[in-house]
């Protein structure tokens, strides 16, 4: 008999496929080829047994394949991962979304008076990205909370609140603390995770698995887009019985089906981005990212990637907050990256970008293909454009974030930074 | 953003020099609002001619330009109208041709100054170019001037001699977006038009005689003779029919009027309001001052009238007429004349080098004033007259939504936790612009709190209108009497901070913070379980002014830090947790806007999610390490920083043993501030950051009170 003990299943995958998870306050005693589990506190556990589970991790999935770094591999996997999160769940013919993990809680979820989405960092950004579509489809207030701040504040939570916990690893300490808090307050809890058997997936009432596969790079890339789609699917699923939303739901579902191929198109921007990093961006150590509406989350996520991977101080700003102080910094010529894909706010975004151009800000604009509004400025060298396919406004952020992932990656490569193991960051943040 | 100023004198003799000085002085007082170019328009030497002077840069540059042009300053005018503008570029970079006033043609037939953004200006410009007009500038405002000329000429050709306000209505029909607008024309000598939509505008009235009434009637057109919709693109034939039909209807209406009493009543009200200056109807010397901000009017008169959106003010023959550019059911019939309370001396700098410094040092007084007469320290009570009648409704609210921009948003973040603690009502804090973009669901049992120093912030105003439409109860927390938000909300609290001239908000932040805390205390005053907490907070508030005075003594130390540790740095990280997260964000904002250093506020516990990658021995870090329930976790986060060779500056409480011990073994510095209740500590902790921003800017030789690209009141969205 052999036993392997680990804090993460990735290190076990090559040796075994059967595992037992310890709960809090468990004491495992291994001797004479036997495993004994004791409880350090009387009455603190409901369960009298621990099930042996089967690991599904494949060794090959953890290899880099033809890519130089895991991060690059995972960026390119987004064509498949976005497809996987929808597989068997989105039916484009009947325009329905099926989420088996939530089915038993349908009544409670649709009765929600308020939805609270709780997460940290990249998962927090995916919640921000999905928030407007929840509000639109369900017509209930939606709060997005940083898990840490949520717990610090001892927020008001009620029985008819629905709390959604988003975490790639399912082990993020702050998010788990928030989850325990909400369970105590009797709210209905949903987990959106990428690891089956993780704490959050086991403690929440119900949930959705993002089916993303292992993510080895520290910087979250494919998990972000998968979480984004999972959340949109939840919103579609919860709003299914509203007649007034039929057309909108149909529009979104049809657009979801072509997202994977559109991502493939965006990835073709890589040569242009490499050139851009070489010529324009490499020598800078401060960046500003501007987004509005659905694209504010894209700006936040992009800024986060650049901090983590390229070590540049980047900050995301709501485009229309320019007038509130941020423009003071713009004239010192930090590179400015602005999201200007088409949606309800396009004229206002164009106006803000005009103001930047007037101050010689020379922005990089992520816009849709065939968008002519900056053609003249482009000729004059005032702007650089990165063109992405157009999709429904609430899904555009999935495409828009990918150029930023590539920029972060290539900036790091150009600066000779270890991409997959950046200093001071961790995949799971279990400790405070 | 931009500033508008207009001056009209009627039967008051003024030399051209005096008129120029009045206009330029008006701009000087608006300079803090936006300042990359300035200009004025006055009557020329020949009848029906206009002089326009404009220049890039500050008001002082305009003075030099006028001196250079050397107009005859001794010519006197018994009646005159002049307009002026200070600009913040939104379309077209700062260049002389892009300065306002903008004109319709080389003969200066129509001259316009404009605040705001015309969102359909590209289409208008294309249309006008196709009709043969030649543009001199890249501005959206020039479209307005040329549109005036086009519509004037078209109507003239069709035999219609329109009144100035009638012509203006036709122009406004074509404009989309926001505007605060003044227009002057040689075709309407000694007349000026003022109108607004989304941008603030007020009119000051000055006369030797006592005002007869304190309101001006709004003049609505006859119901069945409303102005016709005349689209610009219609052909001449259909275009020409409109006004003629309007007159026919009007005549018919008069003939059909069989109710003499009603007619008399109308005439009486009409003449009464128009002649509000005169007892006997004889012409009276009068001066009008039109401005986008009361600060430029207060020197001349305290009697002011605020225009509403879609009001159209027409000043001529010593009279002020208010029309509506579009009719609304239930719209107010009058505009009241209010008395400003702002004193001139309050606006001046006093012994300080900059308004910002003055305002930082005023915080012991401004915080005291916010609380004065509202907190009873003996009985531990909070009395907010502006909210008193509405408190039971607020207590029953399903949700509180706090909506603001910039620094005001940070004051909401700072107080959110105490609201939730004291009221047990869920609280959302929203950036106004994002709130609008999302079309957030708002219900009748929501209470929406709008916080704005100026009371004119465009995004906050739009969000307010959005919430009113949905039946929510609205509360305003503002610092300006008579501002749009204070007049449109159901109830509110005035923060009594006094005028804030420096573009970076300092004393308004602390006053807003206190006003919000008082609001939260009011909500909880019927709860037994909150009594001890309320007493603790109220007694803590009592000490705040004195404690702020104490923190200000850190200035020499901070000045030195800025000259040594922080000099020549490009980036800065601020760490705060819990109540201090808002202080970190606000501190970062101050540093960004004043010293142009890229700084970011981070929740201390979020370090490990990426931000820690930035930490090394070179990056300056400021951390809030004052005592509260999260203190051990904050210490742990800071240890992670020092373990990676970071050497933070810790803002901690006086005589704190933990930091005293650590500073012996770790490379860190401390700034010691007094200790107070956790939910009030942010009031103390922000002061060192304000001073830091100020001295970083001064050491860089930056103009502290007028930072580039920024404006005091963001009135465009």
Swiss-Prot record, chain A:
Keywords: Repeat. It holds the Pfam family SIS. GO terms for molecular function: carbohydrate derivative binding; glutamine-fructose-6-phosphate transaminase (isomerizing) activity. It comes from the Eukaryota. InterPro entries: GlmS/AgaS_SIS, GlmS/FrlB_SIS, SIS_dom, SIS_dom_sf. Residues 105-244, 277-422 form the SIS domain. GO terms for biological process: chitin biosynthetic process; fructose 6-phosphate metabolic process; protein N-linked glycosylation; UDP-N-acetylglucosamine metabolic process. Disulfide bonds: none annotated. This is Uncharacterized protein YMR085W. It comes from Saccharomyces cerevisiae (strain ATCC 204508 / S288c) (Baker's yeast).
UniProtKB/Swiss-Prot annotation, chain B:
CDD domains: GFAT, SIS_GlmS_GlmD_1, SIS_GlmS_GlmD_2. It is an enzyme of class 2 (transferase). It comes from the Eukaryota. One of its GO terms (biological process) is protein N-linked glycosylation. Disulfide bonds: none annotated. Residues 390-529, 562-707 form the SIS domain. Induction: The activity of this enzyme increases in presence of mating pheromone (transcriptional regulation). Its EC number is 2.6.1.16. Pathway: Nucleotide-sugar biosynthesis; UDP-N-acetyl-alpha-D-glucosamine biosynthesis; alpha-D-glucosamine 6-phosphate from D-fructose 6-phosphate: step 1/1. It catalyses: D-fructose 6-phosphate + L-glutamine = D-glucosamine 6-phosphate + L-glutamate. The modification Phosphothreonine is found at residue 334. The active site is at residue 2. The modification Phosphoserine is found at residues 253, 336. GO terms for molecular function: carbohydrate derivative binding; glutamine-fructose-6-phosphate transaminase (isomerizing) activity. Residues 2-318 form the Glutamine amidotransferase type-2 domain. SUPFAM superfamilies: N-terminal nucleophile aminohydrolases (Ntn hydrolases) (SSF56235), SIS domain (SSF53697). Keywords: Aminotransferase, Glutamine amidotransferase, Phosphoprotein, Repeat, Transferase. PANTHER family: GLUCOSAMINE--FRUCTOSE-6-PHOSPHATE AMINOTRANSFERASE, ISOMERIZING (PTHR10937), GLUTAMINE--FRUCTOSE-6-PHOSPHATE TRANSAMINASE (ISOMERIZING) (PTHR10937:SF0). NCBIfam families: PRK00331.1. Present with 14300 molecules/cell in log phase SD medium. Involved in amino sugar synthesis (formation of chitin, supplies the amino sugars of asparagine-linked oligosaccharides of glycoproteins). This is Glutamine--fructose-6-phosphate aminotransferase [isomerizing]. It comes from Saccharomyces cerevisiae (strain ATCC 204508 / S288c) (Baker's yeast).
């Amino acid at each position: 008999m052999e036993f392997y003990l680990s804090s993460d299943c990735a290190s076990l995958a090559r040796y075994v496929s059967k595992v037992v998870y310890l709960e809090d306050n468990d004491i495992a005693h291994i001797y004479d080829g036997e495993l004994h589990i004791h409880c350090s506190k009387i009455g603190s556990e409901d369960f009298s047994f621990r099930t042996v589970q089967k690991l599904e991790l494949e060794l090959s999935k953890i290899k880099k394949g033809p890519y130089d770094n895991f991060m690059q591999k995972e960026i390119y996997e987004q064509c498949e991962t976005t497809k996987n999160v929808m597989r068997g769940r989105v039916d484009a013919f009947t325009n329905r979304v099926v989420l088996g993990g939530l089915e038993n809680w349908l009544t409670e979820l649709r009765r929600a008076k308020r939805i609270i989405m709780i997460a940290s960092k990249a998962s927090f950004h995916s919640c921000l990205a999905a928030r407007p579509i929840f509000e639109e489809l369900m017509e209930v207030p939606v709060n997005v909370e940083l898990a840490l701040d949520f717990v610090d504040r001892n927020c008001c939570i009620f029985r008819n609140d629905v709390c959604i916990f988003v975490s790639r690893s399912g082990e993020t300490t702050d998010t788990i603390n928030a989850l325990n808090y909400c369970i105590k307050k009797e709210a209905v809890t949903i987990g959106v995770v990428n690891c089956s058997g993780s704490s959050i997936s086991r403690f929440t009432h119900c949930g959705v698995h993002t089916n993303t596969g292992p993510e080895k790079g520290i910087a979250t890339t494919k998990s972000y887009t998968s979480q984004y789609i999972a959340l949109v699917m939840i919103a579609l699923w919860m709003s299914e019985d509203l007649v007034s939303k039929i057309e909108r739901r149909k529009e979104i579902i049809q657009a979801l089906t072509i997202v994977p191929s559109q991502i493939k198109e965006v990835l073709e921007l890589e040569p242009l981005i490499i050139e851009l990093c070489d010529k324009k961006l490499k020598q800078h150590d401060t960046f500003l990212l501007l987004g509005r509406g659905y694209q504010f989350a894209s700006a936040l996520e992009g800024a986060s990637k650049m901090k983590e991977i390229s070590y540049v101080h980047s900050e995301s700003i709501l485009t229309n907050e320019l007038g509130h102080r941020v423009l003071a910094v713009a004239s010192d010529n930090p590179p400015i990256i602005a999201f200007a894909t088409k949606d309800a706010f396009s004229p206002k975004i164009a106006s803000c970008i005009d103001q930047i151009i007037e101050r010689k800000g020379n922005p990089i604009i992520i816009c849709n293909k065939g968008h002519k509004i900056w053609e003249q400025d482009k000729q004059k060298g005032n702007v650089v454009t990165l063109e992405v396919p157009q999709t429904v406004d609430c899904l555009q952020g999935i495409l828009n974030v990918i150029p930023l992932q590539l920029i972060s990656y290539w900036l790091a490569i150009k600066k000779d930074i270890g991409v997959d193991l950046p200093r001071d960051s961790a995949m799971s943040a279990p400790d405070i | 953003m931009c500033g508008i100023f207009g001056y009209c004198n009627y039967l008051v003799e003024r030399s051209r020099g005096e008129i120029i000085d009045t206009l330029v002085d008006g701009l000087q007082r608006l300079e803090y609002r936006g300042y990359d170019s300035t200009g004025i328009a006055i009557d020329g030497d020949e009848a029906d001619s206009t002089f326009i002077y404009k220049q890039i840069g500050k008001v002082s540059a305009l003075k030099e330009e006028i001196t250079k042009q050397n107009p005859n300053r001794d010519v006197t005018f018994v009646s005159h109208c002049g307009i002026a503008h200070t600009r913040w570029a939104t379309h077209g970079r700062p260049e002389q041709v892009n300065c306002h006033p903008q004109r319709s043609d080389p003969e200066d037939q129509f001259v316009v100054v404009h605040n705001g953004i015309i969102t359909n200006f590209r289409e208008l410009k294309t249309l006008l170019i196709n009709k043969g007009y030649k543009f001199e500038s890249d501005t959206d405002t020039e479209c307005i001037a040329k549109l005036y000329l086009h519509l004037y000429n078209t109507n003239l050709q069709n035999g219609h001699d329109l009144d100035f306000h009638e012509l203006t209505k036709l122009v406004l029909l074509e404009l989309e977006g926001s505007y605060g607008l003044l227009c002057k024309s040689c075709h309407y000598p000694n007349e000026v038009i003022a109108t607004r939509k989304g941008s603030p505008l007020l009119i000051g009235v000055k006369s030797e005689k006592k005002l007869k009434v304190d309101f001006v009637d709004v003049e609505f057109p006859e119901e069945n003779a409303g102005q016709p919709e005349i689209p610009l693109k219609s052909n001449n034939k259909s275009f020409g029919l409109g006004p003629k039909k309007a007159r026919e209807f009007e005549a018919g209406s008069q003939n059909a009027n069989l109710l003499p009493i009603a007619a008399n009543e109308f005439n009486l009200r009409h003449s009464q309001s128009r002649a509000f200056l005169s007892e006997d109807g004889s012409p009276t010397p009068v001066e009008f001052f039109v401005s986008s901000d009361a600060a430029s009017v207060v020197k001349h008169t305290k009697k002011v009238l605020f225009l509403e959106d879609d009001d159209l003010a027409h000043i001529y023959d010593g009279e002020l007429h208010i029309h509506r550019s579009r009719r609304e059911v239930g719209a107010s019939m009058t505009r009241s004349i209010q008395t400003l309370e702002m004193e001139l001396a309050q606006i001046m700098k006093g012994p300080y080098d900059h308004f910002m410094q003055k305002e930082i040092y005023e915080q012991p007084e401004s915080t005291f004033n916010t609380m004065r007469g509202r907190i009873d320290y003996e009985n531990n009570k909070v009395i907010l007259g502006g909210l008193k009648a509405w408190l039971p409704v607020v207590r029953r609210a399903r949700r509180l939504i706090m909506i603001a921009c910039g620094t005001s948003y940070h004051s909401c973040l700072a107080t959110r936790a105490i609201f939730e603690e004291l009221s047990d009502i869920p609280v959302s804090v929203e950036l106004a612009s994002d709130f609008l973009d999302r079309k957030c669901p708002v219900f009748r049992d929501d209470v929406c709190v709008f916080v704005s120093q100026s009371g004119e912030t465009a995004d906050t105003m739009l969000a307010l209108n959005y919430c009113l439409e949905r039946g929510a109860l609205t509360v305003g927390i503002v610092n300006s009497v008579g501002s749009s938000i204070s007049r449109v909300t159901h109830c509110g609290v005035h923060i009594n901070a006094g005028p804030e001239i420096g573009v970076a908000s300092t004393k308004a932040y602390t006053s807003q913070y206190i006003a919000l805390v008082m609001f939260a205390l009011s909500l909880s005053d019927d709860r037994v379980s909150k009594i001890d907490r309320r007493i603790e907070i109220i007694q803590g508030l009592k000490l705040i002014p004195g404690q702020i005075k104490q923190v200000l003594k850190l200035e020499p130390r901070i000045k030195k830090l800025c000259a040594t540790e922080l000099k020549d740095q490009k980036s800065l990280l601020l760490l705060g947790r819990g109540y201090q997260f808002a202080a970190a964000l606000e501190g970062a904002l101050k540093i960004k806007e004043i010293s142009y250093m890229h700084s970011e506020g981070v929740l201390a516990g979020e370090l490990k999610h990426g931000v820690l990658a930035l930490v090394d021995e070179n990056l300056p870090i400021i951390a809030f390490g004052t005592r509260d329930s999260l203190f051990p976790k904050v210490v742990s986060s800071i240890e992670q920083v020092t373990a990676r060779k970071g050497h933070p500056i810790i803002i901690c409480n006086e005589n704190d043993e933990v930091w005293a011990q650590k500073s012996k073994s770790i490379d860190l510095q401390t700034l010691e501030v007094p200790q107070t209740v956790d939910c009030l500590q942010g009031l103390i902790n922000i002061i060192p950051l304000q001073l830091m921003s100020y001295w970083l800017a001064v050491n860089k030789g930056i103009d502290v009170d007028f930072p580039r690209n920024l404006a005091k009141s963001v009135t465009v969205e």
